[in-house]
Regions:
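Surface-exposed binding/hinge segments that line
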Residues: 66, 74, 217-260, 274-279, ...
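Short, solvent-exposed loop/beta-turn-alpha elements that line the ligand-binding surface or hinge
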Residues: 145-174, 251-272, 362-367, 407-413, ...
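Acidic-aromatic pocket-rim loops
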Residues: 467-521
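Aromatic-rich, solvent-exposed beta-strand/loop patch
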Residues: 236-252, 269-312, 339-354
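Aromatic- and charge-enriched surface segment that lines or borders ligand/interaction sites
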Residues: 19-22, 41-43, 140, 171-215
Length: 582
């Protein structure tokens, strides 16, 4: 008899209690089990073999035997569910737990990790929020952008030093006289559904993208896209753009079927990258290695990310036979790898290419004066906020920020003189642990100085939409930025396409910012973008439009059998190259 059938019978006798010997007869046990005495003896024997109970029968009719139940029903269910999870029978495990998703999630975390079968590596992770649809043409948070990079390829990529590298296009060139960028595609490219990718595919896709508000500003200077032959795409611009290849190396320019752009609310997506999406629902995201990937096939076969809504889940991890828990913590994303009895361990830490900062909103009903902005900047200095976190015993693994990127020189500003603050100050941000805690800390400081503070937290997309349609009217806006792997182009886009930043600056300052960025785009090589953007960011800070606070520290800890685990810009482990020597 299967363990699941035995469980049903065990549930019937659990009423006698666990851990205490009782004297009973076979007939009495049979009555509890709703079966015959003969079948009852068989059931008791099978349960005893599994150590669920201890049965000491006495010979003779109506002799009272000894029965001891060894395990609580809840513990038994967990044990059986755990076995099913390890076998990949997730629906059965959930049924055993009576559809208790919280318990199911906790068991998932204890079993997540890597499994190696005949050299093939499968990864299972847990994450505490549901992923949005993995498509490039929607605004996404950091984790979704990481998965965009796994599911889609661009025409080209750009290294963190700004050097452009081939992807679906093997060569490219820029005609400075005619403002034309030409890309030459590899032959034999296909999407995950085996549909061919050629120049017409790219032209159709970019025609669709150009019509979307999400792309209109970045692609406004593209006047024509043509396909002279199936492996050649030509972009004609109306103004110079030396870094255009870097722009389209961004995750939002991942190559997808043009028809997918019009499809909404369908998680079954078709990409062109190293992994394909085989399942995506409210419970999990499952990726499978794509054998038709243009480059070397990834080393991992399957990656499953289970959604576990557990507020206690703070630290992500990755390992073999060990918990993998990935979540956005107060200090960004941390990845810890723990393997029992591991013979070696390692740790990598890096300061993110990004920043958590406050914006002073010019579109609020009563905009702050320069003196007030300067004074508040002093009041909410990150060192002061850090002291508040320490008093509250809140772990905040971050570096104090004096500019928007840690590689940029600190912006030194004079201390703000005391200024009368508004009676009411409103703070907005998006629903992210670090922003919520910063908002509460800032509220505490400003309340001490006589202001009544109200905090509103929007969804990530809602915050951007309110800025775009002009209805974001809170006094202070808390947000953050984090560069993708194409650092130079990503930094540019984080300024140029940032609805929230442009909205808070007001029309005059926004025009100034546009002029500076257009100048960068026209005359600066991609590899020099970060150098060119630094004085622009520093000016916004020195004029008290932006108040930098923290750079998050990203950490990857691991013990055990996995080889060459590295940390990506998004704070997630590089699942493409994880492998095991076992």
């Amino acid at each position: 008899m299967s363990n699941l059938n035995l469980l049903r019978y065990y549930q019937r006798i659990i009423t006698i209690g666990v851990g205490s010997e009782i004297k009973t007869t076979v007939q009495e046990v049979a009555d509890l089990l709703c079966t015959s005495p003969r079948h009852a003896r068989n059931l008791l024997s099978q349960m005893q073999e599994l150590d669920w109970l201890t049965w000491q029968p006495k010979a003779g009719r109506n002799q009272r035997s000894t029965l001891l139940l060894n395990i609580e029903l809840s513990a038994l269910k967990e044990s059986l569910a755990l076995e099913r999870i390890q076998q990949g029978k997730y629906e059965r495990a959930l049924a055993i737990l009576d559809e208790d998703e919280a318990m199911f999630g906790r068991l998932l975390k204890t079993t997540s990790g890597t499994s190696v079968q005949e050299g093939r590596v499968n990864i299972q992770l847990t994450y505490k929020r549901m992923f949005e649809r993995i498509v490039p043409h929607q605004l996404h948070r950091c984790s979704e952008r990481f998965f965009l990079r796994q599911v889609y390829c661009c025409l080209v990529s750009s290294h963190d030093n700004g050097v452009v590298r081939p992807e679906l296009a093997h060569h490219w060139r820029y005609d400075e006289d005619n403002y034309q960028w030409t890309f030459y595609l590899r032959p034999g490219l296909t999407f995950h559904n085996d549909t061919p990718i050629d120049a017409d595919t790219v032209v159709s896709l970019f025609a669709k993208l150009s019509a979307l508000p999400y792309y209109q500003k970045e692609l406004a200077h593209v006047t024509d896209i043509t396909a002279p032959h199936p492996l050649k795409v030509v972009f004609t611009l109306n103004k110079p753009d030396r870094g255009f290849a870097g722009l389209i190396s961004g995750v939002k320019y991942g190559i997808q079927p043009a028809g997918q752009v019009n499809v909404a609310n369908n998680n079954s997506v078709i990409g062109s990258g190293p992994f394909s999406v085989v399942e995506h629902d409210k419970n999990k995201l499952k990726l499978q290695a794509f054998d038709g990937y243009y480059a070397c096939r990834v080393l991992v076969d399957l990656v499953t990310i289970w959604i576990v809504n557990d507020e206690k889940m703070e630290n992500p991890s990755l390992s073999s036979n060990a918990p993998i828990q990935v979540s956005e913590t107060t200090s960004g994303i941390e990845v810890s790898i723990q393997t029992p009895n591991a013979s070696h361990s390692s740790q990598h830490s890096r300061t993110e290419d990004g920043c958590l900062f406050a914006l002073f909103n010019q579109h609020t009903k009563h905009p702050l004066t320069r003196a007030q902005r300067r004074y508040i900047t002093e009041l909410i200095h990150p060192q002061r906020l850090l002291e508040l976190f320490r008093k509250e015993k809140t772990h905040y693994g971050s570096v104090l920020a004096n500019n928007l990127l840690p590689i940029w020189s600190p912006v030194l500003r004079q201390f703000g003189e005391v200024s009368v603050l508004p009676k009411t100050i409103t703070i907005a941000g998006y629903n992210y642990t670090a922003l919520r805690r910063c908002a509460r800390a800032i509220s505490s400081v400003l309340t001490e100085h006589g202001s009544k503070v109200q905090i509103v937290m929007y969804s990530y997309r809602e915050l951007s939409e309110k800025a775009e349609n002009g209805t974001l009217n809170e006094t202070l806006i808390l947000t953050n930025t984090n560069l993708d792997d194409n650092r130079h182009a990503s930094a540019f886009s984080n300024f140029y396409s940032n609805n929230v930043l442009y909205h808070t600056l007001g029309e005059v300052n926004a025009r100034w910012l546009d002029e500076q960025l257009e100048n960068v785009r026209a005359f600066t090589p991609l590899e020099d973008y970060l150098t060119a953007l630094e004085p622009i960011a520093s000016t916004l800070i020195s004029e008290y439009w932006i108040a930098p606070m923290f750079h998050h520290t990203q950490t990857l800890r691991f013990h055990g059998v996995l080889e060459d685990v590295s940390l990506t810009n998004w704070g997630w482990p590089d699942i493409r190259s994880v492998w095991s020597s076992d």
